[in-house]
Amino acid sequence: MDQVVYHTDFPGLNLLKRGKVRDVYDFGDRLLIVATDRLSAFDVVMPDPIPGKGEILTQISLFWFDQVKDIVRNHLISSDVNDYPEACRPYAETLAGRSMLVTKTEPLAIECVVRGYLSGSGWKSYQKDRTVCGISLPDGLRESDRLPEPIFTPSTKAEAGQHDINISFDEAANIAGRETTEKARDLSLAIYRRGVEVADARGIIIADTKFEFGFVDGELILIDEVLTPDSSRFWPRDGYAPGGPQQSFDKQYVRDYLLSLNWNQKPPAPDLPPDVVANTRKKYSEALDLLVG
């Protein structure tokens, strides 16, 4: 993990888009997804990379794709650069460990969020009216409490610089169709439950997470990243103490730093001090070590 990659520039390859973290190249019915070391918080991309982050995210996603392959098909074709199109070969050193060749899909127009614990925007919503995305929850819950059952709380999809908006199931169904939204909900809950089981055995609580799905030949399959510190809240099981914020293995550390500043959560983002960068990288590395070994 010596090479820091903030953004990629591969002459001869067709850059389809730059997301908040990933650069995506188009190969017809396939895509090359490259996880850079960019970090986003509050839907804004930070100016400072987290060294090695793209490789960590990729290895964790590959781990989970394998762990849940009996639940849902995924878009992965290969993460071995030797299997990539010939045009990728000059960039093999940059691509190795931080990229995937995947099947192109028609992405689902909603984000599929599952919450097993009360934290973040879910906690804020609960404090207002005891609901999260239109789902009523019991009285008396504290911040970071485990919910009686995991809940599906979809959101809109935001472009870089915009904010995702939490929506109800019915609102999601109006966007994506009811049958599709029900399928996405059922898959999301099944993947989350499997993830919780696997992570718990390794000392990690997955408090909440976000999945993305896409259609290929009429089938809804799992795409993008899966149960990573970017898409999830990872808490150490040891030391879990509901009633307040938890220690974490994810970018909450960066969020907390940014909340200590007088920043309006709109671009441009402030610079991250070296210690925040180093500690964030350490937390991501700890998550990888615990999960994958």
Curated annotation (Swiss-Prot):
Its EC number is 6.3.2.6. It comes from the Bacteria. One of its GO terms (biological process) is 'de novo' IMP biosynthetic process. The keyword Transferase does not apply. Pfam families: SAICAR_synt. One of its GO terms (molecular function) is ATP binding. One of its GO terms (cellular component) is cytoplasm. Keywords: ATP-binding, Ligase, Nucleotide-binding, Purine biosynthesis. Pathway: Purine metabolism; IMP biosynthesis via de novo pathway; 5-amino-1-(5-phospho-D-ribosyl)imidazole-4-carboxamide from 5-amino-1-(5-phospho-D-ribosyl)imidazole-4-carboxylate: step 1/2. PROSITE patterns: SAICAR_SYNTHETASE_2. It catalyses: 5-amino-1-(5-phospho-D-ribosyl)imidazole-4-carboxylate + L-aspartate + ATP = (2S)-2-[5-amino-1-(5-phospho-beta-D-ribosyl)imidazole-4-carboxamido]succinate + ADP + phosphate + 2 H(+). Belongs to the SAICAR synthetase family. This is Phosphoribosylaminoimidazole-succinocarboxamide synthase. It comes from Desulfosudis oleivorans (strain DSM 6200 / JCM 39069 / Hxd3).
